[in-house]
Every structure is written in structure tokens, then in C-alpha cells.
A protein has these predicted regions:
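C-terminal substrate-binding/catalytic lobe of Rossmann-fold NAD(P)-dependent oxidoreductases
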Residues: 49-117, 207, 212-344
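Short glycine-rich or small-residue beta-strand-to-loop segments that form or flank ligand, phosphate
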Residues: 23-30, 181-183, 277-284, 344-350
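NAD(P)-dependent Rossmann-like dehydrogenase/reductase catalytic/cofactor-binding core
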Residues: 1, 324-378
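N-terminal Rossmann-like NAD(P) cofactor-binding subdomain of oxidoreductases
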Residues: 1-222, 227-230, 338, 360-363, ...
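Short, well-ordered loop/turn and helix-capping segments at boundaries between secondary-structure elements
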Residues: 44, 201, 253, 257, ...
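A generic structural signal for alpha-helix starts
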Residues: 190, 285-288, 355
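Short phosphate-engaging motifs
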Residues: 136, 162, 247, 289, ...
Length: 378
């Protein structure tokens, strides 16, 4: 029985010699919270025996003083939330290079994306990940494509206009070779869309409301000060802050059948990482019971097509910090599930930094034509 079951689960990988992954240059434009986590993941994979096919070649930032490179290396090496970098980091200031686990990463200083010629650094046909959030439309992001050495751009924020917003596992199949600029949507959209797809596929979603209890971000103030956004000027570490979120409406860019069916709000809370989305939905077909609904999510997390996006927790002791470093887009907390007639309330934990970064990497791999094998095979 085992001899029959294993080939079925491993799919085409059985007896397949495999080709070396295509080498794909990657450039990070920006080096904030998401940029550094993307760098960590890419460097972690580069130093593994299997490699990844994605080579982090350069990071573009604005220079902040003489010790800029040393400080950025320190931020990559030490993280108050995600812990120390797994490996060795060296700094070559003379060549503006950080060497991580033997992998050299060139730091290019520029405040204008149109002024960089990446081919001068031996970079060609690169995928550029813009994680600054400064430009979110095609005209703004096209500036990168005008630079020699850049072939495609991935935005780590919700894209505006007709730009494709990709939630890996849900609609990454719509990416084509002709797409020069795509968006990886937001952390919250990535967390809730897979769970909503599971619900919609099984029961149908007529309407719903999404409430996100979100960790504070760099966009908020440490102490009370001016902020152009309502309420966000108040101290992030002392207050719960009601604010807006476009995540619920953005779901329809990945699941068009849910357009106009979802509303959403957000509450920023005094925690540095890991957030929770509460999905309150009316179903077309009643779920029957919380146990039935939980079993649906449990099975999906084990061998469903969305198993890399949907996690499952049944621990009565789980709290937010337990999900720091979670590689899934979201984790359903089964003990909080509520089902009443045709209504369901589902609680989804998500690491809004690392979990989202893993989703971004998956989109990057798809754009580069490289998909990491996962098992069971689907």
C-alpha cells in the first residue's frame, strides 16, 4: 500500500532527475520591515543545498549617513521580533556590499529610480520588488522598467487601477509572461482571501464583514504627533486605534465573485507583529456546525490546494506570539469558530510581516518561472 501511496502523493517528482532551477536576478527596492524579511528568506534559500533559482543581487536605498551600510547590516542581522539572522553577515564598505552566508549583495544608493543602471553591476533581466509603497500605480512603477537590467516589477502593496493583485494560491494562475508589473496585494488580503475561498467553494458567501485586529506598523506614531490619517497620529503603543482597511474590498480582485459582498474595518493594537482577521459571513448553504466547518479547514491545511496559505490551530493556549514566523498566509483558530444557521464567524491569525513575505516570495517564484515542489502533489 505504501508503495502505491507515495508515488501518488509525490506526483511527477518520482523518478524525475530534475533540472537546475533557472537563475533569476532579484533586486529589492527598499529595505524596511518587508524588504529585510524578503532578504532573509532569499538568502536562507540561496545557502541551502537545493538553492532557489532566485538570486538576491542588490538592494536600492537612500543613503543615511556615513555608517549607513553598517547599520543596515545590523538591522538585517538583528530583529526584535523575528530574532537573529541564521548565519554570518559581513560588511564590505569599500564595495558597498553586505555578504550574508557567503552571498554578496550590492547596496545601491539612489533616491530616483530612473537614475540606476543595473547592468553596471552585472545585473540583467532582473525581477525588482518595490517594497517602499511610494508608487502603487503602473505609471509610477514603470520607472523601474526604464532602467537597464530590470525586466519585471512586483509591488508589495495593493496595486491601483487595472494592475493584477495576486494572492498566491488563489489567483496566481492569471500571471502571464506579458505581465511586467503585478501586485502581491496586502498582508490582510493575503490572510483572508484563502479562507474566504474555502468558505465560498464549500458553502457560497452571500455577504460578510471583515474586522482586522492589526499590529501597529511604522506608519503610526510612537507618541502623539501629527499624522495626515485620522486617529493614526495617536500613540501606537498606548492605544487601540480604529482605522480603515481596503483589504475586504480588495478580495474581489482575487475572487471576482465576491465583489460588493464584503465590508471591512481595522483596529490597530499595541503589539509589534501578528494580527487577526475576524470573518463574519452569511453563507448560501448552512455549514451545519462549527465542527463541520473546522473539519473543512483542517483538511485544507493538511492536503488541500491552499495548504500553504491556510493553517489550522486547535490549541486552547494559542496566543498571538505563537504565530510569529508562521509561513502560511493565515491560521484558522478553530476553537473560536462560531456557526449559527447560515452564519459563520471564523478567526484567522496571521503574521502580517513574515507570513506575508512568504506569500510575496511565492509570487516572485511564479514570475521567475520557478515553483518550489510541495507535497502532497496537486
Amino acid at each position: 500500500e505504501l508503495s502505491m501511496w507515495l508515488p501518488e502523493q509525490l506526483g511527477s517528482s518520482v523518478n524525475h532527475q530534475g533540472d537546475q532551477p533557472k537563475e533569476q536576478d532579484v533586486v529589492l527596492y527598499g529595505f524596511g520591515r518587508i524588504g529585510r524579511l524578503l532578504a532573509r528568506i532569499l538568502l536562507e534559500r540561496s545557502s541551502s543545498p537545493l538553492g532557489s533559482g532566485l538570486n538576491l543581487r542588490a538592494v536600492v536605498v537612500r543613503k543615511n549617513g556615513d555608517k549607513d551600510l553598517v547599520k543596515r547590516a545590523s538591522l538585517l542581522e538583528r530583529d526584535s521580533v523575528h530574532g537573529p539572522f541564521k548565519g554570518v553577515i559581513e560588511v564590505d564598505e569599500e564595495n558597498s556590499t553586505i555578504i550574508a552566508n557567503g552571498v554578496p549583495v550590492r547596496f545601491i544608493y539612489s533616491s530616483d529610480p530612473t537614475t540606476v543602471d543595473y547592468t553596471e553591476y552585472g545585473i540583467k533581466d532582473a525581477l525588482l520588488v518595490d517594497n517602499t509603497g511610494r508608487w502603487r500605480d503602473v505609471p509610477g512603477l514603470e520607472q523601474h522598467l526604464n532602467c537597464p537590467g530590470i525586466s519585471r516589477v512586483l509591488l508589495t502593496a495593493p496595486g491601483k487601477g487595472d494592475m493584477k493583485n495576486i494572492v498566491f494560491g488563489v489567483n496566481d494562475n492569471v500571471i502571464t509572461d506579458e505581465d511586467k508589473i503585478v501586485s502581491a496585494a496586502s498582508c490582510t488580503t493575503n490572510a483572508i482571501t484563502p479562507a474566504l475561498k474555502v468558505l465560498d467553494d464549500a458553502y457560497g458567501v452571500e455577504r460578510g464583514h471583515v474586522e482586522t485586529v492589526h499590529a501597529f506598523t511604522n506608519d503610526q506614531n510612537l507618541i502623539d504627533n501629527f499624522h495626515k490619517g485620522d486617529r493614526r497620529g495617536r500613540s501606537a503603543v498606548l492605544n487601540m486605534v480604529i482605522t480603515e482597511t481596503g483589504a475586504a474590498k480588495a478580495v474581489s480582485k482575487a475572487l471576482p465573485q465576491l465583489e460588493g459582498k464584503l465590508t471591512g474595518n481595522a483596529i490597530r493594537v499595541p503589539t509589534p507583529d501578528v494580527s487577526m482577521a475576524i470573518l463574519n459571513v452569511k453563507l448560501t448553504k448552512p455549514a451545519g456546525s462549527a465542527e463541520e466547518l473546522n473539519e473543512l479547514f483542517r483538511r485544507e491545511s493538511i492536503d488541500g490546494e491552499l495548504r500553504r496559505q491556510v493553517g489550522y490551530s486547535d490549541s486552547p493556549e494559542a496566543v498571538s506570539t505563537d504565530f510569529v514566523g508562521s509561513r502560511t498566509a493565515g491560521v484558522v483558530d478553530s476553537l473560536a469558530t462560531v456557526v449559527t444557521d447560515d452564519s459563520a464567524i471564523v478567526y484567522v491569525w496571521y503574521d502580517n510581516e513574515f507570513g506575508y513575505s512568504c506569500q510575496v516570495i511565492r509570487v516572485l517564484e511564479r514570475m521567475g518561472g520557478y515553483d518550489v515542489p510541495s507535497y502532497p502533489a496537486k
